[in-house]
């Protein structure tokens, strides 16, 4: 996990946030130098210090707070600096030393420290024990394997060291836990999880003997790292930090867990969302209304409508906002009919809707392509509930028309509005016109938007593209990301159209060709107009096989458990041919596939999609 894991400076780990990297690096350097390399052979200090008390005895005598602990460690590290350099230089100048000479020079002066240290940091070697060159080399090898992220060999090396009586130190265990958490995707996840549990148990054993002041200081650092990961959207690393804090007997509070839940929704981390929900449920026996709303929003943004419905049904208290969230969740994830049914249930329970709830219904009708029902609800809004339509309601109605592609009707509705359409109305129509390929109408709307509010149009909008937020441009760094796959061995992978450099390239495309044969048998006809190159028909069909979402689909089928659902996230709108192909392939392999493009979620199962082919 941390930067200083061996006798010599190493490259900084990507796990550390920029804000704390230098400070923690310096702290760990001081800690490793002062605690893990105590020189019991130093004539000036040996008479003052009982090896059975360890360095922590000095901390208790000289300090009273976590800040003073850090200062004490720093002071001790300075006193040991010259001796450390002398020993390292001696090692380099004497490569042919015998084991006995190594034992003589390095007795008590390397990573081996007193097993009775109350802070539990370091190895379990007593000051009277000696270390041979073989163990020393194995420790150096372990550090190198961690730097190279070679999980398999690092675990094997740790087992060999334990057989020789060396107990891994606290910092190295943290690093190894990180590698087990983020391990190589081609290494068996079951092995990594088993190793992670084992390593966390070792950390917990060390923490049980950790001195209180040092434990508080180290815990504070880990909490700062957790907050930094949440701030920068690093969900997996934040979850890893929670595991480390749990092994240190620290329970993350509910407010921090809810913050992570919001980040999961923004990052669309499906498995992580369920993990965070489990940790939240374990931390408190009863969630209040606002906490449940966070969970509903998280599952809604991740495309997990069933999980959101489960949270909704378990809620003992609901208000108007609760119903708005669940109706919007069903609508945006392709369950428009369920959204309408939920609205009917809302009215049957004697509740009175507001404009926001009706806007959710308009959106659901638009996703269903049922404009007529949406207009009936619009009439009911003012007739039955006395709600005067606002400009936000008219924006939602324009969206309802345009979502299924009724662009001419949407323009006619705008021209018949009883109030002057504002920039939001024209911007909504502009975006959806370009999504559906009506560039002429999109350009016309763009001219109106520029006249009303020029700040609404960025460079992409003026050039005829769908407007994107500045934050999205920064996040993507203007780099095209194609199919992103969630759910394969609890990992996320990225694919690009036509990528032939994958480790399993032959198997992937062979599977796609076999699936195509079965698809043709059930009536599939390739939409070759989606292949824009000037090539023959057969070449176009071959080109379509290399679309990123199909590669992601094949990768999931080959590398995940049978019948297990998975998710494909597309950075652009899913093309018609891939949409049809994914529906049929999901039926052939018996999988549920959740596909997310720039417009909506598609949940494909048994050859059908929740979007009803409206997207």
Curated annotation (Swiss-Prot):
PPR repeats lie at residues 288-318, 319-353, 354-389, 390-420. PROSITE patterns: PPR. Residues 521-615 are annotated as: Type DYW motif. Residues 40-98 are annotated as: Disordered. One of its GO terms (biological process) is RNA modification. Residues 490-520 are annotated as: Type E(+) motif. It comes from the Eukaryota. InterPro entries: DYW_dom, Pentatricopeptide_rpt, PPR_At4g14850-like_plant, TPR-like_helical_dom_sf. Keywords: Repeat. GO terms for molecular function: RNA binding; zinc ion binding. Residues 58-98 have a biased composition (Polar residues). Signal peptide: none annotated. The keyword DNA damage does not apply. Belongs to the PPR family. PCMP-H subfamily. This is Pentatricopeptide repeat-containing protein At2g25580. It comes from Arabidopsis thaliana. The gene is PCMP-H75.
């Amino acid at each position: 996990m941390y930067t200083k894991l061996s006798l010599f400076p190493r490259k900084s780990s990507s796990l550390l946030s920029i804000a704390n990297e230098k400070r923690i690096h310096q702290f760990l350097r001081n800690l490793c130098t002062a605690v893990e390399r105590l020189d019991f052979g130093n004539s000036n200090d040996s008479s003052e210090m009982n090896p059975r008390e360890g360095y922590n005895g000095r901390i208790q005598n000289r300090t009273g707070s976590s800040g003073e602990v850090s200062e004490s460690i720093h002071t001790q590290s300075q006193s040991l600096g010259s001796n450390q350099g002398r020993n390292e230089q001696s090692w380099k100048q004497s490569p042919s030393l015998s084991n006995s000479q190594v034992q003589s020079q390095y007795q008590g002066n390397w990573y081996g420290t007193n097993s009775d240290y109350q802070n539990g940091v370091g190895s379990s070697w007593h000051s009277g024990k000696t270390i041979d060159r073989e163990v020393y080399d194995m420790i150096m090898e372990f550090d190198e394997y961690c730097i190279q992220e070679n999980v398999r060999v690092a675990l094997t090396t740790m087992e060999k060291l334990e057989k020789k009586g060396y107990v891994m130190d606290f910092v190295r265990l943290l690093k190894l836990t990180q590698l087990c958490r983020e391990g190589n995707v081609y290494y068996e996840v079951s092995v990594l999880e088993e190793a992670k549990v084992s390593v966390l148990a070792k950390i917990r054993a060390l923490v049980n003997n950790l001195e209180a002041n040092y434990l508080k200081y180290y815990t504070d650092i880990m909490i700062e790292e957790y907050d930094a990961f949440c701030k920068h959207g690093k969900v997996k690393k934040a979850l890893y930090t929670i595991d480390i804090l749990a092994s240190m007997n620290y329970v993350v509070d509910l407010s921090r867990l809810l913050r992570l839940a919001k980040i999961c929704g923004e990052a669309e981390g499906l498995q992580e969302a369920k993990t965070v929900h489990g940790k939240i449920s374990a931390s408190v026996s009863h969630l209040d209304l606002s906490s449940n709303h966070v969970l509903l929003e998280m599952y809604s943004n991740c495309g997990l409508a069933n999980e959101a419905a489960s949270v909704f049904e378990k809620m003992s208290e609901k208000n108007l906002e609760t119903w708005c969230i669940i109706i919007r969740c069903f609508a945006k994830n392709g369950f428009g009919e369920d959204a309408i049914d939920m609205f009917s249930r809302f009215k049957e329970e004697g509740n009175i809707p507001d404009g926001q709830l009706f806007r959710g219904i308009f959106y659901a009708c638009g996703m269903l392509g049922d404009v007529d029902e949406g207009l009936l609800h619009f009439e009911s809004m003012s007739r039955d509930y006395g709600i005067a339509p606002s400009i936000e309601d008219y924006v939602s109605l324009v969206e309802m028309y345009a979502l299924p592609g009724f662009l001419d009707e949407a323009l006619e509705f705008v021209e018949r509005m009883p109030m002057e359409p504002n920039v939001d109305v024209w911007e909504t129509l502009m975006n959806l016109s370009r999504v559906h390929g009506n560039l002429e109408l999109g350009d016309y709307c763009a001219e109106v938007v520029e006249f009303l509010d020029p700040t609404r149009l960025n460079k992409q909008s003026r050039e005829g593209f769908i407007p994107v937020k500045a934050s999205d441009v920064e996040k993507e760094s203007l780099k095209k990301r194609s199919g992103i796959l969630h759910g394969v061995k609890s990992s996320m992978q990225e694919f690009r159209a036509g990528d032939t450099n994958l480790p399993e390239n032959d198997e992937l495309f062979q599977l796609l060709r076999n699936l195509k044969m079965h698809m043709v048998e059930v009536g599939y006809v390739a939409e070759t107009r989606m292949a824009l190159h000037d090539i023959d028909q057969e070449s176009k069909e071959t080109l379509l096989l290399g679309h990123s979402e199909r590669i992601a689909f094949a990768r999931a089928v080959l590398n995940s458990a049978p019948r297990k659902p998975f998710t494909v996230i597309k950075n652009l709108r899913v093309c018609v041919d891939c949409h049809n192909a994914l529906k049929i392939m999901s039926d052939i392999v018996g999988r549920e596939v959740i596909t997310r493009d720039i417009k909506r979620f598609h949940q494909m199962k048994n050859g059908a999609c929740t979007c009803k082919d409206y997207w």
